A protein has these predicted regions:
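Short helix/loop capping segments that flank catalytic or ligand/cofactor-binding pockets
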Residues: 179-181, 228, 293, 344-347, ...
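Short, exposed beta-strand "edge-strand" segments with a Pro/Gly-rich flavor and a Y/T-containing core
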Residues: 18, 86, 92-109, 167-169, ...
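Short intrinsically disordered coil segments
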Residues: 185-189, 299-300, 351-353, 363-369
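Surface-exposed polar/charged interaction patches
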Residues: 92, 113-114, 148, 312-315, ...
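P-loop NTPase motor domains
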Residues: 3-9, 14, 23-249, 325-328, ...
């Protein structure tokens, strides 16, 4: 966060009582993509492709959040109802009359209304009670995303987040309680989705010569939080990263150990491990033997490489005389693996300016400084008394 701020970027604080992201509001991107001109040979196909891509991302986000809340995959019927419901809102929601973009609560109202196109997907056979039964689970999940649900107004209001293309952006989730993994995962999913959508839209606009071509890099940190909140989120992450990969968007997925990718079934674990196997480059910090997962199989790691990584995982030794702890042996050290080629070990050395804006241990550092200052005063008092 300090780094992005120092670079003149945007910092959005997400959590209860803070910024709002309307998860249905892709209007800024869609209005820009509407400006893509007809192609000489393909007509309006480039414009339609770009707009359809944004709508697919929106649908992927909504269904992903539904699966997070349910901790299981939703049915194909429910997925189809979500996609068709979003399509109906695009066609029928009167933005000028309402004075705002459609929200998730509007999708709830639409599903409740038993719109004929949704009734057809639900196969209610003209029976209102059957429709209510067929749509009940879907409505339960959608209501949870509204201001009446567990997330409050974070996703169901007018967006206060407007990402400016060309500037660094970070989403700050620090206000969310560490124990609320579901809320953390939901906000992660939304921030990753919107960040990816902005970059994707910029690439479409650059293809149409409406933007200078820029190279973006998406950082998806704390992957373990999302997967721990619900194993079903592995499908959301898989879909999102595949979309990004297909569009040539550079992305980094960061987690602590390969154990974070061991999920509730072999099928889900295989999908999660695939994130690593498909990565062009993997940067490995210190790991214990038990934390390596399938790294040995995927990257054919030598005994020397494994030994080096395990050595890096050790804690810094404590000086019994001064009470200070030595720098951990693995601080700043990584092994770069590209396929099955021998890895390249390297050490990151930060400049003074970089050290300050990358200090993620600031709270502990401040506490330690206070402790040392208090200890010094106590020692001085005891010496004076003696």
């Amino acid at each position: 966060m300090d780094l992005i701020d120092a670079m003149g970027g945007q910092v959005f604080h997400l959590g209860p009582g803070q910024e709002v992201i309307n998860i249905l509001d892709f209007s800024q991107l869609l209005s820009e993509l509407e400006q893509i001109p007809d192609d000489i040979t393909r007509g309006d196909a480039p414009r339609r492709e770009a707009i359809d891509a944004m709508k697919r991302r929106r649908a992927t986000l909504v269904t992903g959040l539904l699966e997070l809340g349910r901790d299981a995959r939703i049915s194909e019927k429910e997925r189809s109802m979500v996609v068709e419901g979003l399509r109906i809102l695009d066609e029928e929601f009167d933005i000028e009359k309402e004075g705002r973009q459609p929200r998730i609560s509007d999708l709830v109202a639409l599903v409740r209304s038993r719109h004929p196109r949704l009734a057809a997907i639900a196969q209610d056979r003209g029976d209102e009670e059957r429709y209510a039964e067929r749509a009940e689970l879907l409505l339960d999940g959608l209501i949870a995303l509204t201001s009446s649900g567990v997330y409050g107004s974070i996703f169901d209001g007018d967006s206060t987040v407007q990402i400016e293309a060309g500037r660094p952006v970070v989403f700050d989730l620090s206000s969310i309680d560490d124990g609320d993994l579901t809320l953390q995962a939901a906000v992660q999913a939304v921030s990753w989705s919107f960040g990816s959508a902005v970059v994707d839209a910029e690439k479409y606009l650059a293809d149409a010569a409406l933007r200078p071509r820029r190279h973006y890099f998406l950082v998806m940190d704390e992957l373990w939080r999302m997967l721990r909140a619900s194993s079903a989120m592995v499908f959301f992450v898989d879909a999102l990263t595949r979309l990004n990969r297909a569009r040539g968007i550079a992305q980094a997925m960061i987690t602590h150990t390969m154990d974070d990718l061991k999920l509730s079934s072999d099928e889900l674990t295989t999908i999660a491990w695939g994130f690593v196997a498909r990565s062009a480059m993997v940067f490995i910090g210190g790991l214990a033997q038990s934390e390596m997962g399938n790294l040995e199989q995927v990257f054919a790691m030598s005994a020397r490489e494994k030994s080096m990584i395990m050595d890096w995982s050790a804690d810094g030794s404590l000086n019994p005389h001064t009470g200070t702890q030595a720098v951990p042996p693995g601080r700043g050290k990584f092994l770069l693996k590209i396929g099955k080629k021998p890895g390249t070990p390297f050490e990151v050395e930060l400049t003074a300016a970089e050290m300050d804006v990358n200090n993620t241990n600031r709270a502990w550092t401040t506490a330690a400084e206070r402790f040392r200052a208090n200890a010094a005063r106590v020692t001085e008092t005891l010496e004076e008394a003696a």
